[in-house]
UniProtKB/Swiss-Prot annotation:
Residues 205-240 form the UVR domain. InterPro entries: GIY-YIG_endonuc, GIY-YIG_endonuc_sf, GIY-YIG_UvrC_Cho, RuvA_2-like, UVR_dom, UVR_dom_sf, UvrABC_protein_C, UvrC. The gene is uvrC. It comes from the Bacteria. Interacts with UvrB in an incision complex. This is UvrABC system protein C. Pfam families: GIY-YIG (PF01541), HHH_5 (PF14520), UvrC_RNaseH (PF22920), UvrC_RNaseH_dom (PF08459). The keyword DNA repair applies. It comes from Chlamydia caviae (strain ATCC VR-813 / DSM 19441 / 03DC25 / GPIC) (Chlamydophila caviae). GO terms for molecular function: DNA binding; excinuclease ABC activity. One of its GO terms (biological process) is SOS response. Its main location: cytoplasm. SMART domains: GIYc.
Length: 605
C-alpha cells in the first residue's frame, strides 16, 4: 500500500506486523499491532503519535506493507525475526555478542585454580566448572581479587606451579596455601576450594557456618595459625556483606532495566544482580528509534536474552509490558518473572537503573552528539540531519593533492563511509578542488545522500559548494562553511564565522557555542583524515617513483630508502654503496647505474 493512497479501510483489523519502506524499497521501520488498522492510522493523524521521530519517518516512508498473524505472540516473534533480517534504521537492534565473561575451575589438574575466561558455551563438564556470565572483564577481575583475599587458592600457571621449589610471596601474605611445595594437604586445599565454589554460587550463609565450625575445630586441635586464617576470612566476608547490603536482594538473581529518552537519544541500561550482589551495568544507546516504550522494551528483551546463556529469576521493567507469553519465549523451562514494582527494593533497583541510563545519555550527548536544539534555532533546520559529510583537502605546494570527506551518521563518526579522491591538477586552487571533489562525490550516487555538508572555508567556499550542488540538480542538502577569524587563527578559543543558508553573509558564533564546537569537531576529523591520506600518498610516491626499474620491487626499494633516505640520493649512490645493500644482485646494480646515467643525460639536455 502506497502512503499517498492510504485510507483506513484498506488496512485489516487483524493482529500483525507492518513494514514501512522508502522509495528504494529499504525497510525503515518494523512494528507490530493487535489491531493493524488502528495502529497504522495513528501515523496519519496530526496528534496521533507524539514521538519526535515520527514526522521524519513519515517523510521518508512511501509504502507500508502488512503481514497478518493469528495473535499478539506471533506478531512479537515475527517482528523480532524481521528486525534481525532487515536491520531497519528506526528500530532497536543489538549486536550479536556470542562470547561471555566467566570464571572457570579446571578439574584436570590435581590442584585446581580459578581463572577468568571468555567462552561461547557456558556449560560445566567433567573437565571444568563454569560460573557466570558476568557483565565485564573488570567484574571478573574484581571477583577474582576478592576470592584471592578470602580463599587462599593458587593463582600461578601450571608451568610455574611445576617448577616452583619454594613458596612465593603470596604464601607469606596468607593468600595462598602453597600446594606447589606441599605446605598443605589435598584435603585442606579441597576444603578451601569448596568454600570458594559455595561463594560463587551465592551460598554465603553456608560459608559463614562452615567457617565458624572450622575455627572451632582448628582451635580444639590447637591449629591456631589455621584458625587465624579461617577467622580473617570470616571477618572479610562479614564486612563485605555489610558494605554491599547483600541481604537487600535475598541472594536473588535479578536484572533491572532502566529506560531514558532525551531528544534523539534513547538509552537502555541493564543492572545485573547475581546471588544478591550488584555486579554492574550495561548500557545500550540507540540514536534512531521510533518504537513506543512497550514495543521498544519487549523487542530489546527478546534480543538481549537471546544472546544470554541464562535468564535471571526476575526481570524488572520500568513499565508493565502486559505480554503473558514473553517470559516463556525467553525460557520455556524456567520462565523468568517479569514485573514492574512500585515499592520496595525492586523499585530502588529500577530507579538506580534509570539514573544510570540518564547519566550515560547525558554524558554521551554532551561529549559527542549533535546539539539539535541550537541547530534548529540558528540554521532554521526543521529536519534532523541523520547523515552529515564534512569535506577537506590537503596538498604540498600543489603536489600529492587529495580531497576527502568524512561521515557523521546516527550521532557517531562512521569511518567505514570515509572516502578519498586523488587530485592531480587542481590542488593549487581550493575552489576548483572543492568543485572537483563534490562533482565526483555526487556524480555516481552509490551511497546515501547527506542531509548536510560541512566545508572548511569562508563565503567563497560556501558559494562554490552551493553552485556545484545546483549544477548537479541536488536539492534539500544544507551547506555549512566554517571560517576561522584571520586575526585569531591560532587561538584555542577562537571566534569563527558560520556561513549557511539562513546566514549566507556569515554569522559569528561564540567560542562556547555547542554547535560551533560540534562543527569544529567534524572539521578536525576531516583535516586529520585528509592529512593522513596526503602523507600516505607522498610516502607511496616516494617508495614507488613513476619510473619503474626492472628487478627493483617493493622490498628492495624499502632497503634502498632506509639507507639513502630518498630516491634522489639513490640516484647519486656509487657502485660500492649499492653493492653494500643486502639483496641487490649485480643485474639490479647495473640497472640502477644505467638509470643514473639516463637521468643525468636528461638533466644536461
Amino acid at each position: 500500500m502506497r502512503v499517498k493512497d492510504f485510507t483506513p479501510k484498506l488496512v485489516p483489523t487483524s493482529p500483525g506486523v507492518y513494514l514501512m519502506k522508502d522509495d528504494s524499497g529499504e525497510v525503515l521501520y518494523i512494528g507490530k499491532a493487535k489491531n493493524l488498522r488502528n495502529r497504522i492510522t495513528t501515523y496519519f493523524q496530526k496528534q496521533g503519535d507524539s514521538r519526535e521521530r515520527i514526522p521524519f519517518l513519515m517523510k521518508k516512508t512511501t509504502t507500508i506493507e502488512t503481514i497478518l498473524v493469528s495473535n499478539e505472540t506471533e506478531a512479537l516473534l515475527l517482528e523480532n525475526n524481521l528486525i534481525k533480517k532487515h536491520h531497519p534504521k528506526y528500530n532497536v537492534l543489538l549486536k550479536d555478542d556470542k562470547t561471555f565473561f566467566c570464571l572457570a575451575i579446571s578439574l584436570t589438574h590435581p590442584w585446581p585454580k580459578i581463572d577468568a575466561i571468555r567462552t561461547k558455551a557456558i556449560t560445566s563438564s567433567k573437565r571444568q566448572i563454569i560460573f557466570g556470565p558476568y557483565v565485564s572483564a573488570e567484574a571478573c577481575r574484581t571477583l577474582l581479587e576478592v576470592i584471592s583475599q578470602w580463599f587462599p587458592l593458587r593463582t600461578c600457571s601450571n608451568r610455574e606451579f611445576a617448577s616452583r621449589r619454594r613458596p612465593c610471596i603470596l604464601y607469606e601474605m596468607k593468600r595462598c596455601l602453597a600446594p606447589c611445595v606441599h605446605l598443605c594437604t589435598h584435603e585442606e586445599y579441597e576444603e578451601t576450594l569448596e568454600k570458594a565454589v559455595l561463594f560463587l554460587k551465592g551460598k554465603v550463609s553456608e560459608i559463614i557456618q562452615d567457617l565458624e565450625k572450622s575455627i572451632e575445630k582448628a582451635s580444639q586441635e590447637q591449629k591456631f595459625e589455621q584458625a587465624g586464617i579461617y577467622y580473617r576470612t570470616l571477618k572479610l566476608i562479614q564486612q563485605a556483606m555489610e558494605k554491599q547490603h547483600v541481604e537487600k536482594f535475598h541472594f536473588q538473581n535479578i536484572d533491572a532495566i532502566g529506560l531514558y529518552r532525551k531528544y534523539q537519544e534513547t538509552v537502555i541500561t541493564v543492572l545485573t544482580v547475581r546471588s544478591g550482589k550488584l555486579l554492574g551495568a550495561r548500557h545500550f544507546p540507540f540514536s534512531e528509534n521510533a518504537q513506543e516504550d512497550t514495543d521498544l522494551l519487549s523487542s530489546f528483551i527478546l534480543q538481549y536474552y537471546a544472546n544470554q546463556p541464562q535468564t535471571p529469576k526476575e526481570i524488572l521493567t520500568p513499565i508493565p509490558l502486559n505480554i503473558p507469553e514473553l517470559p516463556y519465549l525467553l525460557n520455556k523451562d524456567t520462565p523468568p518473572q517479569l514485573r514492574s514494582p512500585k515499592t520496595g527494593y525492586g523499585k530502588e533497583l529500577l530507579t538506580l537503573a534509570k539514573n544510570n541510563a540518564k547519566v550515560h545519555a547525558e554524558t554521551t550527548t554532551q561529549s559527542s552528539s549533535l546539539p539539535y536544539e541550537e541547530m534548529k534555532k540558528i540554521l532554521k533546520s526543521p529536519d534532523y540531519p541523520y547523515r552529515i559529510e564534512c569535506y577537506d583537502n590537503a596538498h604540498l605546494q600543489g603536489s600529492h593533492g587529495v580531497g576527502v570527506y568524512i561521515v557523521y551518521e546516527n550521532d557517531a563518526f562512521s569511518p567505514k563511509s570515509y572516502r578519498t579522491f586523488s587530485i592531480s591538477s587542481l590542488a593549487h586552487n581550493d575552489l576548483a578542488t572543492f568543485h572537483e571533489v563534490l562533482s565526483r562525490r555526487f556524480s555516481s550516487l552509490t551511497s546515501s545522500l547527506p542531509d548536510m555538508i560541512v566545508i572548511d572555508g569562508g563565503r567563497a567556499q560556501y558559494s562554490q559548494a552551493k553552485k556545484t550542488l545546483k549544477e548537479l540538480n541536488l536539492t534539500g542538502i544544507q551547506v555549512v562553511s566554517l571560517a576561522k577569524e584571520a586575526s585569531n587563527h591560532s587561538s584555542s578559543l577562537r571566534n569563527e564565522k558560520l556561513f549557511c543558508d539562513t546566514f549566507p553573509q556569515g554569522i559569528q558564533l561564540a567560542p562556547t557555542s555547542k554547535l560551533l564546537q560540534f562543527f569544529q569537531k567534524l572539521r578536525d576529523e576531516a583535516h586529520r583524515f585528509a592529512i593522513s591520506k596526503h602523507r600516505r600518498k607522498r610516502y607511496k610516491d616516494l617508495l614507488f617513483p613513476q619510473e619503474k626499474i626492472p628487478g627493483i620491487g617493493e622490498v628492495k626499494r624499502k632497503r634502498l630508502l632506509q639507507k639513502f633516505k630518498s630516491w634522489k640520493q639513490v640516484m647519486k649512490a656509487s657502485q660500492g654503496e649499492l653493492e653494500a645493500i643486502p639483496g641487490l644482485t649485480k643485474k639490479d646494480i647495473q640497472q640502477l647505474l644505467a638509470k643514473q646515467v639516463e637521468d643525468s643525460k636528461l638533466t644536461e639536455d
